[in-house]
Amino acid sequence: MLKSSSQGKESQMPALDELMSLPGVYGAIEFSCTGELGQTRGDLEPDFAELVAQMCAANMAIYRMQATGWTKLTGQKGFLPERGFAFLALDHVVMGMNGNAILARSKDFDYDAAYQRFNATA
């Protein structure tokens, strides 16, 4: 199992199964802060799942860099620690938090339910 980069604890396997039960979700992955792929759920090609893990880690790193810079530049606080993100496309969503990410169909996805589930499994 991967250690969650943001929480410093082992991720729980039931978390991925719980995330898979959300409306529209067709895949779930664990990812490390370095982009390593952990466990997966759903029918995801291994190369695609690895690419998603790397994208999730890169997105979190870019957010951290931007939030740190903005905080130092403006003095505004509240952007850190970084927790998660959602990428939206026409038909698909990738949402990640606490070292886990889900892939979902946009038309069926419930962002509020996903946010609550991510927080419940953290």
Residues of each region from the PLM?
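Non-catalytic interaction/Regulatory regions outside core domains
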Residues: 2-122
